[in-house]
Design a protein with these regions (language model features):
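Active-site entrance/lid segments in N-terminal catalytic domains of soluble metabolic enzymes
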Residues: 1-207, 340
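Conserved active-site-proximal phosphate/metal-binding subdomains
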Residues: 182-187, 191-213, 218-352
Length: 352
């Protein structure tokens, strides 16, 4: 065999290599996106925490420094109604007292994709728009498509993949439970039934006709090659890029990546997400019933996190990472992208 076994993603999106740089809020921005694009990957900007003006600025910064397709990523979660924060704030009370902060000074919430952001997409006309936690309402989705964007959805089960395919997405991310950050479950499956990536890829590839993008626990060329053999057309890498200098994570977060101990926790946002352990997880345990639903838990935690980080303590904020974190290589993003692709291709061609 010569070349990539499945070129559908490459032909559809127009990248040099079948790699998507994952859109990691607070861990991926303009610098990482530009570096990944210069290496031939699909660069991504995480937009769920941006205002429309901030998105416009970041988009133009990327466009001025790199060529190639660009992905804008949004969340489509349902905002919970009538949730009670009292038990959560009571659990956090000792930390409010320790850091001398007012529990009423909450932080911003991740808001779902809405008409205002859709108008920005129509103005900017990115090549790709991806969504986490299902898809926006049909009218907004059609507007995104009419703006010329390819649409990528995220699925954690075959059922979710079929749901996305029926609504006309152009490619689907197969997110295994090994992945760092928020699990994108949206059809109510039990977290205890979460699927590993290498069980998920072939089942999803058999179930849908669009390209499948493997995500979760892929940390080097061996993982990329294995995902391709199982039926993936591309891979999405997030944790692998956290070791790159373009990633604006804390020194504490970076140091813990090599330890390899990750857990699912709902303490940071109320939604299950995988990351390395910090002080809050160590002291309260990774999952608490008191935490309100996603994304509400983050607002009550925000003043504690802000005060703690000013004091040099980073254990009260998310330090997302996937299970393959120890495989990371501390290389600039462009160089890392090219190396990972070359290593995978060498294995697939029998040279590695």
């Amino acid at each position: 065999m010569v070349g990539w076994p499945d070129r559908r993603f490459l032909d559809l999106i127009g990248t040099d290599v079948p790699i998507v740089q994952a859109p990691m809020a607070a861990a991926a921005g303009v610098e990482l996106c530009v570096g990944a694009m210069k290496g031939g990957a699909l660069g991504s900007l995480p937009c769920a925490l941006l205002t429309p003006d901030q998105l416009r600025v970041q988009f133009e910064q990327v466009r001025s420094r790199a060529t190639g397709p660009l992905n804008l990523n949004f969340f489509c979660h349902q905002m919970p109604q009538g949730a009670d924060n009292n038990a959560w704030r009571a659990l956090l009370r000792p930390y409010y007292d320790e850091f001398g902060v007012d529990p009423g000074n909450g932080g911003p919430l991740r808001l779902p994709f809405d008409p205002e952001m859709c108008a920005v997409v129509e103005q900017l006309r990115p090549e790709v728009v991806s969504f986490h936690f299902a898809l926006p309402e049909p009218e907004l989705l059609e507007r995104v498509k009419s703006a010329g964007a390819m649409v990528i959805g995220n699925a954690t089960t075959v059922e979710e993949a079929r749901w996305l395919a029926a609504r006309g997405v152009d490619a689907i991310i197969a997110q295994g439970f090994e992945a760092g950050g928020h699990t994108g479950r949206f059809l109510g499956s039990d977290p205890a039934e979460a699927m590993g990536l290498f069980a998920l890829i072939p089942q999803m590839a058999d179930a849908v006709s669009v390209p499948v993008i493997a995500a979760g626990g892929v940390g080097d060329g061996r993982g990329i090659a294995a995902a391709m053999v199982l039926g993936a057309s591309a891979v999405q890498l997030g944790t692998a890029y956290l070791h790159s200098p373009e990633t604006p994570i804390s020194a504490a977060h970076r140091a813990r990546l090599t330890e390899g101990h990750t857990v699912f926790t709902n303490l940071m946002t109320g939604g299950l997400a995988r990351g390395v352990r910090g002080r809050l997880v160590d002291e309260l345990g990774p999952v608490r019933d008191e935490a309100p639903p996603y994304p509400l838990a983050s607002a009550a935690l925000a003043p504690i996190r802000s005060a703690a980080e000013k004091a040099g303590e980073y254990g009260f904020g998310p330090m997302w990472a996937g299970q393959a974190a120890p495989l990371g290589q501390a290389l600039p993003a462009a160089e890392l992208t090219r190396k990972l692709a070359a290593d995978a291709l060498a294995i697939l061609e029998g040279r590695g």
